[in-house]
A protein has these predicted regions:
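A domain-level signal for caspase-like cysteine endopeptidase catalytic cores
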Residues: 1-55, 87-89
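Solvent-exposed loop/turn segments at secondary-structure junctions
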Residues: 10-11, 37, 58-61, 92-96, ...
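Mature extracellular/periplasmic domains of secretome proteins
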Residues: 47, 77-79, 97-100
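Short glycine/serine/threonine-biased micro-segments
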Residues: 54-56, 66, 106
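A short, glycine/acidic-enriched catalytic loop
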Residues: 59-82
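A short helix->loop->beta-strand "cap" motif at the edges of active sites that frequently abuts
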Residues: 81-85, 102
Length: 178
């Protein structure tokens, strides 16, 4: 199964590279990263691949390129991936996935930087945010080629911490119980 990773990069999501770095040299993997990825290249890659992994910043309306704040993926692009297994790792991706009935593992609000933690009044420091980010991405990297339901189970079982408020918050936003 051919897999496409789309990651509109910016410094605040560099930690996400853990998810796909080890797969960069595989023949059945395509990785699109950077800023301002042309939509023609994205659409062509969406058609040519069987599984799609979206990574970065976003809203319930889709995946953003934080540089320039333009949407890279929206409901207008569903025709290219609606019937494919997808992973949507961006803030409130679960709303997007549920609204469009996708076969997806999708994150809810996902605190990955200090400003987001402050917005949600989470008492934390950068070390705990980094620990949360790394834990989540390492687990997702190990199961990213699985069925979305199995990814959800693996994340729910592995992405835990009794002492990290960021992990606890992110788990709650994904609908996991402790």
């Amino acid at each position: 199964m051919k897999t496409l990773f789309i990651h509109p990069t910016d410094p605040s999501t560099d930690f996400c590279k853990i998810i796909y770095e080890d797969y960069r040299d595989q023949d059945d993997v395509t990785i699109l990263t950077g800023t301002r990825i042309p939509s023609t290249i994205i659409k062509k890659a969406l058609v040519e691949n069987d599984r799609i992994v979206f990574i970065g910043h976003g809203t319930e309306y889709g995946l953003l390129d934080k540089i320039g704040f333009r949407y890279v993926i929206t409901a207008a692009d569903l025709q290219f991936f609606r019937n494919k297994p997808v992973v949507c790792m961006w803030c409130n991706a679960n709303i997007f996935a549920e609204k469009h009935n996708l076969n997806a593992f999708a994150t809810g609000m996902f605190v990955s930087e200090k400003s987001e933690a402050e917005w949600y009044r989470l008492s934390t420091d950068q070390k705990l945010i980094d620990e949360s980010n790394e834990l989540f991405c390492r687990i997702l990297s190990r199961c990213v080629f699985d069925d979305p339901k199995d990814i959800r189970t693996t994340i729910e079982r592995g992405y835990k911490s009794s002492t990290n408020p960021i992990v606890k918050f992110n788990r709650e936003c994904m609908g996991f119980e402790d």
